[in-house]
């Protein structure tokens, strides 16, 4: 038989195995707990590093930059040898020509000087001219002298001007002599500072040594070092830093704590020379001027009627002088007895000089020095012979290329008038971009009165019918002129007339029946019209003429608030007629607007086109 299993024996074996295994389980070592990292020490080191970094950064921020800006960076130049140019407090773009030194004398190209420093110099193709209140000085290129209007010669140790590489260049010493534009040279910074602003400005002395920097903040580059007591001009004040200009013209920022007491002070002229004074003649009362337009005679026969009607007028301006030819000769319709009668009536007489002769060339007349001299001499002699009180210059036909020559003529004429104690007034269009070349700012510096013609808003041979002088146009004309000219020198010119406009349907230019018409293609609706294509013409109408038209056609009037005038229209023979009425109502609003700017006067074009009621309105604003 085979072996049999013994359950009892088997149980004992299993029990024994179990007992043998249990001590192993009991004696097995428990795993060691993991050691905890020392987080406290590591965190402390990390925080310490951050603190050190912050402290270092703070220290860095507190350490002023010692880096100095290069002259190339400061002036935006590429050439290390080129000198930068500062005019008053502005860095100048010298693309028109940089300053340079020649035989120990500093020069500037004429274009750089003219557009950035002084446009009072004028080159006529033969000589460089400069006109002060009483004289015109002339320097020929390459010569070492200049002459005045009386022919007196002044010798210099340098050439006031000469040509270099085809460009006219002006000595800065001559600029200083003529224009009172002084200069300093900083060889360290390679800069030239030209200054001619003698107005009061905030200035102060520095309390400590310091640095002027390119921007506010000590980390910005240094422009220049400054010492205790140095005087600076404060250009802009900030909370902690201010923008200042140093005594060498450099501009930078310094901390406010370095500035002493700031006072408004004018810079003294370095060599003590008195600044030139452009004295002017001003009436003790508001100017109330009337233009008396004449064509073939003096107008003496009309003077009694004018005087009886124009109660309140104190200046009469007869249109007697016209430029006759390019050489500067004039046509003169004046009569001494006219002046005598006007004076007896308490009126000053300012004779008009105009350029209505279309055969003359403005560039020939005003651009040639000998022609200007002839014209000025002729006008001054004629005014003195007549016993008149002044000149009213009315030049309306020149183009922009004549602008500088015309301004030079005004300078020279003003000097001649100043010597003879004659009033000089100059008529101007309402300021617009295309008439900027009339340079009202320069006019305002040298003449007695600048007249703005606040009329011809819509004009002969213009493309659109409209008011001769809307209320808004009067305000705009006065505001823009006073922005360029001291208000006490401004005379606001107003119209005594309107225009009757005629619009006739047409297809082309060939439909014109006379030269007074202009063909207008208004297909795009740009203008206020009844027709897409039309011929437009107009004629000047007096206040009495307006009334006749209104009565003849039995017209009703509509008041236009935005224009400040009555308006009417009618159709006749296929044409559309329109009229913006000038009367005592529109004049009242215009006078109120003009006088609100406190100008030196008002003027009216033209006498004999007004009614008596108009002068009552005028006196309401001028008799104060």
Model-predicted segments: where are they?
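Conserved, mostly hydrophobic/aromatic
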Residues: 316, 393, 413, 450, ...
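N-terminal Lys/Arg-rich, disordered targeting/topogenic segments
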Residues: 1-43
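Glycan-binding loop/region signatures in secreted carbohydrate-active enzymes
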Residues: 273-274, 498-590, 622
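SH3/SH3-like beta-barrel fold
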Residues: 130, 229, 242-246, 254-255
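Glycan-recognition patch characteristic of GH18 chitinases/ENGases
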Residues: 266-378
């Amino acid at each position: 038989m085979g072996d049999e299993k013994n359950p009892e024996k088997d149980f004992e074996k299993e029990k024994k195995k179990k007992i043998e295994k249990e001590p192993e389980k009991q004696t097995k070592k428990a795993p060691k707990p993991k050691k905890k990292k020392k987080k406290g020490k590591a965190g402390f080191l990390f925080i310490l590093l951050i603190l050190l970094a912050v402290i270092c950064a703070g220290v860095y921020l507190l350490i002023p930059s010692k880096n100095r800006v290069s002259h190339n960076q400061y002036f935006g130049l590429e050439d290390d040898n080129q000198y930068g140019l500062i005019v008053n407090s502005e860095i100048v773009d010298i693309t028109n020509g940089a300053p340079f030194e020649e035989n120990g004398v500093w020069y500037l190209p004429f274009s750089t000087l003219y557009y950035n420093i002084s446009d009072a110099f004028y080159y006529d193709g033969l000589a460089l001219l400069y006109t002060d209140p009483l004289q015109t000085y002339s320097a020929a290129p390459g010569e070492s002298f200049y002459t005045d209007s009386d022919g007196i010669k002044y010798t210099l140790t340098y050439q006031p001007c000469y040509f270099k590489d085809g460009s006219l260049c002006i000595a800065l010493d001559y600029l200083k002599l003529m224009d009172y534009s002084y200069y300093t040279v900083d060889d360290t910074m390679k800069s030239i500072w030209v200054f001619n602003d003698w107005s009061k400005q905030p200035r102060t002395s520095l309390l400590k040594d310091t640095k002027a920097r390119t921007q506010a903040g000590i980390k910005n580059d240094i422009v220049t070092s400054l010492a205790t007591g140095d005087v600076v001009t404060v250009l802009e004040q900030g909370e902690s830093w201010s923008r200042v200009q140093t005594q060498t013209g450099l501009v930078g920022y310094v901390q406010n704590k370095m500035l002493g007491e700031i006072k408004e002070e004018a810079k003294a002229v370095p060599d003590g020379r008195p600044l030139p004074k452009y004295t002017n003649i001003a009436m003790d009362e508001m100017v109330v001027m009337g233009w008396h337009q004449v064509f073939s005679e003096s107008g003496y026969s009309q003077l009694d009627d004018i005087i009886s009607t124009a109660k309140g007028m104190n200046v009469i301006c007869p249109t007697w002088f016209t430029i006759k030819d390019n050489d500067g000769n004039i046509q003169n319709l004046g009569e001494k007895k006219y002046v005598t009668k006007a004076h007896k009536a308490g009126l000053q007489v300012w004779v008009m000089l105009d350029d209505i002769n279309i055969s003359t060339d403005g560039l020939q007349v005003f651009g040639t020095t000998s022609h200007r001299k002839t014209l000025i001499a002729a006008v001054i002699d004629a005014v003195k012979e007549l016993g008149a009180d002044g000149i009213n210059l009315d030049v309306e036909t020149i183009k922009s290329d004549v602008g500088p020559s015309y301004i030079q003529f005004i300078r020279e004429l003003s000097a001649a008038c100043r010597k003879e104690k004659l009033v000089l007034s100059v008529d101007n269009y309402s300021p617009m971009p295309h008439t900027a070349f009339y340079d009202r700012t320069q006019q305002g510096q040298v003449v007695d009165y600048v007249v703005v013609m606040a009329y011809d808003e819509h004009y002969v041979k213009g493309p659109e019918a409209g008011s001769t002088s809307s209320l808004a146009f009067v305000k705009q004309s006065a505001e823009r002129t006073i922005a360029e000219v001291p208000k006490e020198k401004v005379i606001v010119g107003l119209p005594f007339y309107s225009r009757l406009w005629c619009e006739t349907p047409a297809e082309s230019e060939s439909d014109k029946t006379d030269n007074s018409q202009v063909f207008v293609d208004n297909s795009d609706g740009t203008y206020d019209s009844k027709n897409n294509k039309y011929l437009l013409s107009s004629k000047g109408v007096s206040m009495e003429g307006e009334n006749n038209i209104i009565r003849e056609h039995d017209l009703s009037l509509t008041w236009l608030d935005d224009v400040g005038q009555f308006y009417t229209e009618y159709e006749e023979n296929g044409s559309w007629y329109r009229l913006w009425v000038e009367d005592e109502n529109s004049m009242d609003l215009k006078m109120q607007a003009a006088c609100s700017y406190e100008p030196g006067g008002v003027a009216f074009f033209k006498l004999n086109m007004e009614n008596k009621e108009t002068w009552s309105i005028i006196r309401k604003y001028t008799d104060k």
